[in-house]
Amino acid sequence: MYMKYRKWHLLLVVCGAWLLLAACSMEVNDKVVDSHPSKSDDRLLVLCEGLWGMDNSCIAYLDQGQLIDKWFQKQNPKQHLGDTGNDIIQVNDTLIAISVNWSNIVQYIYPDGRAVAATENIPNNRRLASDGDYLYCTSYADGGYVAKVDVRTKQVVDTCHVGHEPEGIAYYRGRLFVANSGGYAAQEGHAYESTVSVLDAQTMRELKRIDTGCINLFGQMSQCGQFLCINSAGDYYEVAPRTVVLNMESEEFRVFDFPATYNCTFGNRFYVIGSSYSYNTGVYQYTTHTIDLPSLQAHDGLMEYAAAQPVIESMQSPYGIYISPYSGHLYVSDARGYATNGYVYDFDGQGVQQGKYYIKGLNPAHFLALP
């Protein structure tokens, strides 16, 4: 089954990469913007996905406004991160996990960037969650499953099959909540998924599936206490994207008529940048929203970060959003042409721009602030 996935998707990746390179301006004579130190004390890791199939994922490090590019390679001169970094999380005080999708590994590092070990038997690995003792990783392989990894040994100790092409995963009070996408529907001959699988984390058995009625639960998923913010990407033709906010305590949910492609949480709110794409028009449309918790009241824009709105609207391709839990600073990345180096913007708690950083990496997408 795995060989079938790898051969098919290798063909898709090669074709897609050539199309992307042909369609996007490479902007060889790129103008480098000076990176001025921020007023924030944040120590921030920025995971750049790179281009699928190009083996060029990397991590940039922002240390109180000072940018260190290719940080992982500098800390590990004999290693490179791999192909398509897809997620990064803090497992515990001494361990960080990075899902490197097309390299089929989960890379572990210390907070200082030194590589520790890797789990290398979770093919097509996607998103990560942890309870401190175990790491949970979604995988598109073998019909879609979740792997449970002992963080002491870095070995897979159990698995559980879920829906097709599972994406986001969250741990809450002994249970795992997994957003199933069915994203390979057109290629694999199955329908898009609209369910969230609920697993017992101890036994790794699926307890139920919550049908949200919204297809293709693909993209970033944020957790704020008992609430999850899940993006429904639609089918890119007739079915519009949506946002699903799930209460993991009651297993009730509410659907909003805007996408949450890139989302994060701070305080009692979700902050959302939605990206809507239509094959009918070939056009991306971007929106911003804020969702209050627990009232689930939605607002246009990014509330107290409203001053950042004009800058975000000027970005070519917003590709990630994150608010530091330590400083309250808002970080937004711009992937630009997807085949060129990107930018990361830093805004303070009032949305005033504090810095703009030229990242020597493609598609900066995932953030982690270190304590």
Model regions and ranges:
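Bacterial N-terminal signal peptides that target proteins for export
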Residues: Y2-L12
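C-terminal motif of bacterial Sec signal peptides marking the signal peptidase cleavage site
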Residues: L20-A23
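Predominantly soluble domains enriched in secretory-pathway, periplasmic, or organellar proteins
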Residues: S25-P371
